[in-house]
């Protein structure tokens, strides 16, 4: 599970990206238009990557103990490539996202600043098909779709519920 930002602004508006897949067979990719997030000069792409589908409780490290990421960006103007990602990627395992898992939730410590940056390494041993992600995107529901409770009942004792629970 990942989240991408360009120059500090989030890319896309859906959650639990990219959706589950059997990583032994194929890896889903997603495409985003980041043109509105770019600025003149230097731009920064950041990714927060959790154990999620790859190594979290849902898969119990079947695919590996540490999540892996492949990201490729290509900037085109009038059909011509003017910039693209290269081999200068760096990463840190000491960022604010401590844990993120669909079953166990997320632990995020905003006080932690990524440190101990290391150069990313290309893993050529992975031999699976890349396929476009297919399926519905997970989105946070709009507030107008939330339902308000119809009634609230507060029980003060087991007697109020009409049960004895071992008494």
Where are these regions (language model features)?
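Edge strands and adjacent loops of beta-rich recognition modules
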Residues: 126-167
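Accessory beta-strand-rich segments of carbohydrate-active enzymes
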Residues: 1-122
């Amino acid at each position: 599970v990942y989240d991408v930002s360009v120059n500090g602004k989030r890319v896309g508006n859906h959650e639990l990206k990219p959706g589950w897949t059997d990583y032994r067979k194929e890896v889903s990719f997603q495409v985003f238009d980041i043109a509105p997030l770019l600025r003149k000069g230097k731009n920064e792409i950041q990714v927060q990557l959790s154990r999620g589908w790859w190594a979290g409780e849902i898969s119990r490290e079947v695919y590996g103990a540490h999540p892996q990421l492949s990201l490729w960006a290509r900037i085109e103007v009038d059909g011509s490539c003017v910039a693209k990602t290269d081999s200068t990627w760096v990463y840190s395992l000491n960022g604010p996202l401590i844990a993120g898992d669909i079953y166990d939730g997320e632990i995020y410590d905003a006080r932690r600043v990524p440190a101990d940056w290391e150069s990313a390494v290309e893993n050529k041993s992975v031999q699976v098909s890349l396929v476009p992600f297919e399926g519905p995107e997970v989105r946070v529901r709009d507030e107008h779709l939330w339902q308000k409770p119809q009634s609230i009942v507060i029980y003060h004792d087991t007697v109020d519920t009409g049960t004895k629970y071992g008494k």
